[in-house]
Amino acid sequence: MNDTIPSKDAKVTLRKVTAKTVRTICNLNVSEDQKNFVAPNAVSIAQAYFSKAAWFRAIYADETPVGFVMLAENPKRGQYYLWRFMIDAKYQGKGYGQKALELIIKRAKKNPKAKALYLSVVRAKGSADDFYKGFGFEFTGKMDGIEHIMKLNLKKP
């Protein structure tokens, strides 16, 4: 396996997880102090197979798998939920997550009915609140268990 880290200028793409790539994607992990923030990719992929609303992809920087994303989509109602989003610990801080989230937002906005993209975060040291706020996500004041719900309006006021 190639341990070369792609440059910050790498092209980020979202690709289907295949039988050939699933093991590599399942072996991507966040840092130890982030493990309480996101489920392992193997769990996410298994859950996706039991949810009609799930859409999931591996995140690549050039030809290197660097992360994973899963949305719960209800296109008819214009609702999107960022169910899982992770960048492997050794690839964090290089802009890949930012480029991937831009692609995810763009995907949701392609739907003329798209109203909002939701997500939830555990508010603790090392969580991604500020990362999401940088994209315009705002806290809704609602909770899902211990997770705080954030929302990005996709329709311009």
Residue ranges: model-predicted function:
Residues Q98, R123-G141:
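Conserved active-site alpha-helix within GNAT-family acetyltransferase domains
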Residues S7-W83, D88-K90, L101, K106-R107, ...:
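Acetyl-CoA-dependent GNAT
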Residues G95, P112-K113, G136:
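Short glycine-rich hinge loops at helix-strand junctions in the catalytic core
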Residues D88-K90, K94, R123-A124:
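Active-site acidic-Proline motif in GNAT/NAT acetyltransferases
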Residues A108-S120:
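Conserved GNAT acetyl-CoA-binding A-motif
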Residues N2-I5, H148-P157:
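Terminal substrate-recognition subdomain of acyl/acetyltransferases
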Residues Y118-D129, G145-E147, K155:
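Conserved beta-strand-loop-alpha-helix junction that forms the acyl-donor binding cleft
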